[in-house]
Amino acid sequence: MHDNITSYLTYLPSMAATAWYHKKAGQGKTLEAFVEEARNFTYNTYAPALYKGSLLSASEQNSIAEKLSYFIGLDKAYILRSNNRILMHRFQKNLLADKGLAIGRLDGRFMGDEADDVSEGPNLGDPSSYQIEAAYTAALNHYFAETLNVEMDRPYMTSGQIGGKWRWKPVPDGQYWEPMPVNTAGQLGETMRRNTEMKVLVASGYYD
């Protein structure tokens, strides 16, 4: 259990899209319509429910679990045992548990055949990373060398290889910081106001 409520809210529409793709939820509806339905539930029902926490009645908890099951394709009883909070690695492991497969985190359409079917999360890593990482890294290095003429005296490390050691605190060491979801919007906004020519690309797919 972790207490970053924001993560449960931001992940839910992508979980719904991924469940739709794997035919575990939303069948008979278009992807766009189903994801929009999930977003509306997230904004109007799920967010207030998470903030109510233990003040929710048993009936309300049951209703939320039922809707979550509808959107993300997991068993309602499992969702209730999870206190209506599904951690991403558990979703990756459980959505296709009946097939012994884990799904990707970077891209939920990818699947990996798992040897350990009862682990809490994918035990081989992220299927969408280990299935594309070699090709992605090779293409990126080729682009750097042949198109950008960048000369490197050491191997280029992809983000997946170093991400686990990333320092997430947005303030210098020793400065007070109240733990919270990572939010760099303030710093980014300040930088863009100082540099009015700066352009920012935000890219995220339905299944990311």
Stretches found by the model and what they are:
Residues 1-128:
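Alpha/beta-hydrolase
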Residues 2-27, 152-184, 191-194:
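Catalytic cores of eukaryotic secretory-pathway lumenal/extracellular enzymes that build
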Residues 202-204:
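Short beta-strand/loop motif that positions the catalytic acidic residue
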Residues 207-208:
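Acidic catalytic loop of the alpha/beta-hydrolase fold
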Residues 65, 185-188:
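Extracytoplasmic/secreted envelope proteins and their assembly/folding machinery
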Residues 196-199:
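Loop/turn elements at helix/coil->beta-strand transitions in domains of secreted/extracellular proteins
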Residues 99-179:
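Small-residue-rich helix-loop
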